[in-house]
Curated annotation (Swiss-Prot):
GO cellular component, one term: cytosol
Superkingdom of this protein's organism: Bacteria
Residues that coordinate or bind K(+): 166, 218-219, 221, 229
Name used for this protein in its record: Pyrrole-2-carboxylic acid decarboxylase
Record's keyword terms, sorted: Aromatic hydrocarbons catabolism, Decarboxylase, Flavoprotein, FMN, Lyase, Manganese, Metal-binding, Potassium
Lineage, uppermost ranks: Bacteria, Pseudomonadati, Pseudomonadota, Gammaproteobacteria, Pseudomonadales
Name of the gene this protein is made from: hudA
Function comment: Catalyzes the prenyl-FMN-dependent decarboxylation of pyrrole-2-carboxylate (P2C). Can also catalyze the carboxylation of pyrrole in the presence of elevated concentrations of CO(2) or bicarbonate. Can accept a modest range of heteroaromatic compounds such as 3-methylpyrrole-2-carboxylate, indole-3-carboxylate and furan-2-carboxylate, and shows very low activity with thiophene-2-carboxylate. Attenuates the virulence of P.aeruginosa in a Drosophila model when overexpressed.
UniProt EC number: 4.1.1.93
Membrane spanning stretches: none
């Protein structure tokens, strides 16, 4: 296994060796400048920036932007994401999804518990804790505050100790030892917090920032309730994640993490959190009261690196990490339910607001169904799952379409979906509350925003196709295509 999957420092060094990292030694300001540079990196698909010289910050502290952004080189577009799993830099979406699904079927490998780890090189306890000494960035001009946690994961455990949950979440700085952030009731952190609330106790909590990249990715995967991400990460990389115990509350966190915050989630205290530029690409103008997270201890490596995601228009990590992990989980859900689905992909360009399902048309024909009945079956299966709850729209295409290629998806959507017959709304299915097009009535009702779009011609339900596709792949004999590819440079096109 490539060590980059289990060691964030190794991951950063690997990016540098690949030419996919820029060491920024020019002084920068955590107040918007770091956010602006990182947003431009996403939008230009430039190398990840590692900021070494941050004004008025803890000496030696650094910030890494765009840790899973896409690259401009099409052949290596997903290399930063692939490196999270120790895969080669030319790996694509299908390679990554295949690896994630294989780990779902593998035996979990429990973490290895250590007495000490690199994250304990520096430990602040009690009154020593001062989060404001770190380069906590204001990422967007509209944000309601500075965000410490945008590319880290919460660590919580059920009161009976049976389930350790790692889940990606955001946290806004309130003061030197307090943060605020959402604990959505339907997500795992909310489920576990409610168990502690019923006991009348605050929730023991930690956050890992700059954790093993594979662990961060797994924490963004909607695994089933009760499944501990640490064991899944072990199965994913083929060896245990090394963990150490926190200083104050008995939780276990990855031993080589850059920064660990620990303390508790308040029973009932809240603070206004947000607004914040979000995964869907918008920043709505009003914040919300969210639970307080009290930090009782802070551990960090020498010269710690704080990774950040500057959320907004795609693609950024909410799409490359979260969207990819959802894709793998939805494929598993669909196939376990017997649906004729051979690939699922949350198009990054759709900001994790739709998933495209590739349908095996021969298997579809064997079902003897039609568009309406099939859409209803897909909706019940997918939207009813934990992963499917997060994605409000599904697009069904034949497997002649490569669902990982957005131009093919858009072509199918424009030319195969009938405006009257192929749009199926499911207003009774509950919604994910952060979907941006939901209005006040939808949110009050908790439903109304679910849609399945059928991009399968009626003939495809019988295993046929209405018309031939006029493309290089479909409109020419195989032997001729190969000859053209082999002679491409002879024609004067170089290696393009």
């Amino acid at each position: 296994m490539n060590r980059s999957a289990l060691d964030f420092r190794h991951f950063v060094d690997h990016l540098r060796r690949q030419g996919d990292l820029v060491d920024v030694h020019t002084e920068v300001d955590a107040n918007l400048e770091i956010g602006a540079i990182t947003r431009r990196v996403y939008e230009r698909r430039a190398p990840a920036p590692l900021f070494h010289n941050i004004r008025d910050s803890l000496p030696g502290a650094r910030v890494l932007g765009a840790p899973a952004g896409l690259r401009a080189d099409r052949a290596r577009a997903h290399s930063r994401l692939a490196l999270h799993f120790g895969l080669p830099e030319h790996s694509g979406p299908r390679d990554i999804v295949a690896m994630l699904r294989a780990a779902m079927r593998a035996e979990p490998i429990a973490p290895r518990r250590l007495e000490r780890g690199p994250v304990q090189e520096n430990v602040w306890l009690g009154e020593q804790v001062d989060l404001t000494r770190f380069p906590v960035p204001l990422l967007h001009e509209q944000d309601g505050g500075r965000y410490f946690g945008t590319y880290g994961f919460h660590v919580v455990q059920t009161p009976d100790g049976s389930w350790d949950s790692w889940s990606v979440g955001r946290l806004m700085l309130v003061d030197r030892n307090t943060l605020a952030g959402p604990t959505i009731p339907t997500q795992h952190i909310g489920i576990i917090r409610e168990q502690w609330r019923r006991l009348g106790k605050p929730t023991p909590w930690a956050m890992a920032l700059g954790a093993p990249p594979a662990a961060l990715a797994a924490a963004g995967m909607p695994l089933p309730e009760g499944v501990s991400e640490a064991g899944y990460v072990g199965a994913l990389v083929g060896e245990p994640v090394e963990v150490v115990r926190t200083q104050t509350n008995g939780l276990w966190v990855p031993a080589n993490t850059e920064i660990v915050l620990e303390g508790e989630i308040s029973l009932d205290e809240t603070a206004l959190e947000g607004p914040m530029g979000e995964y869907h690409g918008y920043s709505f103008p009003i914040g919300k009261p969210q639970p307080l997270f009290h930090v009782h201890a802070l551990s960090f490596r020498d010269q710690p690196i704080l990774p950040i995601c500057v959320a907004g228009t795609p693609p950024e990590e909410n799409h490359t990490i979260w969207g990819t992990m959802i894709s793998a989980q939805l494929l598993d859900v669909a196939q376990n339910a017997g649906l004729p689905v051979d690939m699922v992909w949350c198009s990054y360009e759709a900001a994790t607001c739709w998933a495209v399902l590739s349908i095996d048309v021969q298997r579809l024909a064997a079902l003897g169904t039609d568009a309406a009945a099939f859409a209803a079956r897909v909706a019940e299966t997918v939207f009813g799952s934990h992963a499917g709850h997060l994605v409000p729209k599904l697009i069904l295409v034949g497997n002649d379409i490569d669902v990982t290629e957005i131009d093919q998806v858009v072509w199918a959507l424009a030319t195969r979906a009938h405006p009257l017959h192929d749009h199926f709304a499911f207003p009774q299915i509950r919604d994910f509350p952060m979907v941006p097009y939901l209005d006040a009535e939808d949110k009050a009702r908790g439903s109304g925003g679910r849609l399945v779009i059928n991009c399968l011609y009626p003939e495809q339900f019988a295993g046929q196709m209405r018309a031939a596709t006029a493309s290089f792949r479909h409109a020419y004999p195989t032997a001729l295509r190969r000859r053209v590819e082999e002679r491409w440079s002879d024609y004067g096109f170089g290696d393009a």
